[in-house]
A protein has these predicted regions:
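Residue-level signature of mid-helix packing/kink "hotspots" within the transmembrane helices
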Residues: 21, 48-57, 138
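Extracytoplasmic
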Residues: 4-30, 34-36
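Helix-loop-helix hairpin linking two adjacent transmembrane segments in secondary transporters
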Residues: 92-94, 128-181
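MFS-fold secondary transporters
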Residues: 82-86, 102, 172
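Cytoplasmic helix-loop-helix junction between adjacent transmembrane helices
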Residues: 98-132
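Short hydrophobic/alpha-helical segments at membrane-entry points of transmembrane helices
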Residues: 8-9, 91-99
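Conserved MFS/SLC helix-loop-helix module at the cytosolic interface between two early adjacent transmembrane helices
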Residues: 53-93
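Flexible cytoplasmic inter-helical loops of multi-pass small-molecule transporters
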Residues: 173-195
Length: 195
C-alpha cells in the first residue's frame, strides 16, 4: 500500500506543476485578448503566491484537524476550480479572483505532501517528489500545444488541465483509506519503522 500511495503522491506533484507554466506560455496571446499590459502577468502570479503563502501557514492546523488525504483532495479540487475559472475568464479581474483559490490549493498540496513524504518515506523520495513537479511544469505547455494544434484556444488549455485536476480529485477521494493505514518504511540504518 505504501508504494501505491507514493505513486499517487507523485501524480499529485505532477498535477501541481501542470498549471504553473501555463500562464507564461499563454500570456503573449492572452494579454492582448483581455487588453492589459504584459506586466499584468505579475499581478496574477503575485496573488497566486499570496494564496500559496496563506495555505502554507495554515497547513499544520489543517493537517491535524482533517488529515493529509482530505486536505490534499480539497486542495487539488481548489486548483481544479481555479483552472476552470481561468478557462472562462475574459477580464483581468477574473484572473485575479481565480488566482486566490489556485494559490490556496497549490500551497496546500505542496506543504501537506512535502510534510507527509518527509515523515513517512525515505529521504530519496523527497528528491523524486520535486522531480515530479518538474515533469508537470514541463508537460503543461505540451498539453496547451496539443490543444492549440487541434484548434482549441488558451481557454481550452486551462479547461483540459481543470479536467485532469478533477479526475485526480476523484482518485484522491477514493484513496482516502490508504492515507489512514500505517505504512512500514526502512530508515537510514536499515531498521523497519512503522510510520
Amino acid at each position: 500500500m505504501g508504494s501505491l500511495l507514493l505513486t499517487l503522491i507523485y501524480i499529485c506533484f505532477i498535477s501541481l506543476g501542470l498549471p504553473d507554466s501555463l500562464l507564461g506560455s499563454m500570456w503573449p496571446v492572452l494579454h492582448t485578448e483581455i487588453s492589459v499590459p504584459v506586466s499584468f502577468a505579475g499581478t496574477i502570479s503575485m496573488l497566486t503566491c499570496v494564496g500559496t503563502i496563506i495555505s502554507s501557514l495554515f497547513s499544520d492546523k489543517l493537517l491535524h484537524r482533517f488529515g493529509a488525504g482530505k486536505v490534499t483532495a480539497v486542495s487539488v479540487a481548489m486548483t481544479a476550480v481555479a483552472m476552470f475559472g481561468f478557462s472562462i475568464s475574459s477580464q483581468v479581474w477574473m484572473f485575479w479572483l481565480w488566482a486566490i483559490p489556485y494559490g490556496l490549493g497549490a500551497g496546500g498540496v505542496d506543504a501537506i505532501l512535502n510534510n507527509y513524504v518527509a515523515l513517512h518515506y525515505k529521504a530519496q523520495h523527497m528528491s523524486w517528489l520535486h522531480c515530479m513537479w518538474g515533469v508537470g511544469a514541463a508537460t503543461g505547455p505540451y498539453i496547451l500545444g496539443f490543444v492549440l494544434t487541434w484548434g482549441g484556444t488558451w481557454s481550452h488549455g486551462y479547461g483540459a488541465i481543470a479536467i485532469l485536476q478533477v479526475v485526480l480529485t476523484a482518485v484522491l477521494l477514493m484513496s482516502l483509506p490508504l492515507w489512514k493505514k500505517r505504512i512500514t518504511i526502512t530508515d537510514e540504518s536499515g531498521q523497519e519503522v512503522t510510520a
